[in-house]
Swiss-Prot record:
Main location per the UniProt record: cytoplasm
Family, per entry: Belongs to the YbaB/EbfC family.
Taxonomic classification: Bacteria, Pseudomonadati, Pseudomonadota, Alphaproteobacteria, Hyphomonadales
Assembly and oligomerization: Homodimer.
Species whose genome carries this gene: Hyphomonas neptunium (strain ATCC 15444)
Any one GO MF annotation of this record: DNA binding
Signal peptide: none
Function noted in UniProt: Binds to DNA and alters its conformation. May be involved in regulation of gene expression, nucleoid organization and DNA protection.
Disulfide bonds: none
Keyword DNA-binding: yes
Protein name per UniProt: Nucleoid-associated protein HNE_0371
UniProt cross-references to InterPro entries, sorted A to Z: YbaB-like_sf, YbaB/EbfC
Residue ranges of coiled coil: none
Any Pfam family the entry gives: YbaB_DNA_bd
Length: 107
C-alpha cells in the first residue's frame, strides 16, 4: 500500500506542477521577426496575437509583400512560442523520473 500512496502523492505533485506550467505558458510571450526586422509580431500563450509592428518604409510597398512578411513573422513567433512551451514541459516533468514516457499534453 505504501507504493500506492507514494504514486498518489507523485500524481498530486505532478498535477500541481502542471497547473503551474499551464499558467506560465499562458503568460509566455514570443516575438517573431521577418524582413530583417521590418515586420514584428508578438504572440502570447497558445498563439494569441498581441501586436503587429510594421516599419513605415513598407507602407508604400506592394501589399502582398507586407502580407507575406506578416505571415513569416507570425510563423517565426509561433515556432519560438512552441519551443518555449516544450522547454517548460521538459522542466516541469523532469523530476518525475519518466513517470509519463511519451505523454504529450494538448498545449
Amino acid at each position: 500500500m505504501k507504493d500506492l500512496a507514494q504514486i498518489m502523492q507523485q500524481a498530486q505533485a505532478m498535477q500541481a506542477k502542471m497547473a503551474e506550467v499551464q499558467q506560465k505558458i499562458e503568460n509566455t510571450e514570443a516575438d517573431g521577426v521577418a524582413g530583417a526586422g521590418l515586420v514584428r509580431v508578438k504572440l502570447r500563450g497558445k498563439g494569441e496575437l498581441i501586436s503587429v509592428t510594421i516599419d513605415k518604409s513598407l507602407m508604400g510597398d506592394d501589399p502582398e509583400i507586407v502580407e507575406d512578411l506578416i505571415k513569416a513573422a507570425h510563423s517565426d513567433a509561433r515556432k519560438r512560442l512552441d519551443q518555449a512551451m516544450e522547454d517548460a514541459m521538459k522542466t516541469a516533468t523532469a523530476g518525475f523520473g519518466g513517470m509519463l514516457p511519451g505523454f504529450k499534453l494538448p498545449f
